[in-house]
Amino acid sequence: MAKFHAPVIQDNPSGWGPCAVPEKFKDMPYQPFSKGDRLGKVADWTGATYQDKRYTNKYSSQFGGGSQYAYFHEEDEASFQLVDTAKTQKTAYQRNRMRFAQRNLRRDKDRRTLTQFNMQTLPKSAKQKERDRMRLQKKFQKQFGVRQKWDQKSQAQLKPRDSSVEVRSDWEVKEEMDFPRLMKMRYMDVADPLDIECCGALEHYDKAFDRITTRNEKPLKSIKRIFHTVTTTDDPVIRKLAKTQGNVFATDAILATLMCCTRSVNSWDIIVQRVGNKLFFDKRDNSDFDLLTVSETANEPPQDEGSSLNSPRNLAMEATYINHNFSQQCLRMGGERYKFPNPNPFVEEDTEKSEVASVAYRYRRWKLGEDIDLIVRCEHDGVMTGANGEVSFINVKTLNEWDSRYCNGVDWRQKLDSQRGAVLATELKNNSYKLARWTCCAILAGSEYLKLGYVSRYHVKDSSRHVVLGTQQFKPNEFASQINLSMENAWGILRCVIDICRKLEEGKYLILKDPNKQVIRVYSLPDGTFSSDEDEEEDDEDEEDEEEDEDN
């Protein structure tokens, strides 16, 4: 007779599955899966595991974790590839686990510090407690500010620079040259210069200035002497020479501006006049061309506005004032002068010699190939006599310290004597364009030495009093190598600019450095632009109109 046998039922009061694993399934590897997952491998035990067992099932599901390299058979057999069992990608927590731990430790430390600060073990005055609170607050703000700057890489935005001259709507762009292209220019076919005419008289350098240190600094004197900054077309000697020789005329300062233009940051402009087959490079009347820039090439140049002590224009005026005074104070003023064959062409007859600055002009001629005959007016600032009586011409320039807290500056009073190389390296970084121009002018003039004076403010907030902290002497060609100034590239840039201007029609043009881009442009100017004669005629007409109104 049939009999019903009751099956053995396993009661699991704490779960839904069986209480024990059957013998045939014991020790069998198992990976969690879902019925919705597609099967792509026979077995896969390469799934990622957490090092910290507390978070094994907290942040992610393990279902489908072994399907990264699963093979699914499809009709396109070309997609089949063999893969190795590499590690799967770590989760966000695993990647940042160490950083999270450090942040938690730092937060706990700050919390303990605050707790200790809030505990009043000893009675303190109200002022002392406020002082401690402010000190701790500044410490936390400083730490937080550094982390915020590192994370966000926030930097002060530089203000857009102004153009040296306003570009009018009727000016037409004839040519545009970018600095990367100019930096690749090379010209080596430069013949040795020929001296055509030498004018002026020079005072001798006072070697006592070579012994100045930061311990025995010397006050900078205000010397009232006349400095002539005459442009090319107003030079009577160049006008005379242009009738018989040469087809390109300029001054050393104008040429140095063009030859070193790839280092410039601020805007500048040069007027080019083509008369027949001759080119004249001029500077604009009443422009800032002769002002010396300060920290122009620094990462964060001065950006104060208005009448601020450290505004770019006030700093340029201060640097020019210092340079003029030091270039005369370091000479033996009132002594016998070294005279060239011809007198200074810019000195009037009724002017005393002591009122004129010590300067000599050397008019030199270069042949750039077969078609360019270049005549340049170069300058010397002084003369030195060697032990054997040999004469050496020098150019004297000045570097000035305005505030060492800005532009990654170095305190000259502490570092100039012991680490002069570091001071010069900082100045080369902040004033690369200015130093390159000075070096280029000294090479063009044929000066044997370039004298650099280090002048600082007597007080950081006083721009009217200065002290001389030291001097340094270089040979121009050697100094050019130190500052990475390639004269082959400089001559290549000049030759390129001359060739472009010679292709233009007769007229007046303007070479303008873009204030915010590494580009120089050549503009054609309408007749009468920047003409001093036109301004004088307008003034005369205004005066005549006023006289007629008074008569009526």
Curated annotation (Swiss-Prot):
Map out region (Disordered) in residue numbers. Answer: 525-552
The reply to whether tRNA-binding figures as a keyword in the UniProt entry is no
One GO term under biological process is: translational initiation
Give the UniProt subcellular location, in the record's own words. Cytoplasm
Q: Which UniProt keywords apply?
A: Cytoplasm, Initiation factor, Protein biosynthesis, RNA-binding
Question: Is this entry keyworded RNA-binding?
Answer: yes
Q: Which GO terms describe its cellular component?
A: eukaryotic 43S preinitiation complex; eukaryotic 48S preinitiation complex; eukaryotic translation initiation factor 3 complex
- Tell me the InterPro entries matching this sequence: eIF3d
Q: What is known of its domains?
A: The RNA gate region regulates mRNA cap recognition to prevent promiscuous mRNA-binding before assembly of eif3d into the full eukaryotic translation initiation factor 3 (eIF-3) complex.
What is the official name of this protein in its record? Answer: Eukaryotic translation initiation factor 3 subunit D
The source organism is Danio rerio (Zebrafish)
Gene designation per UniProt: eif3d
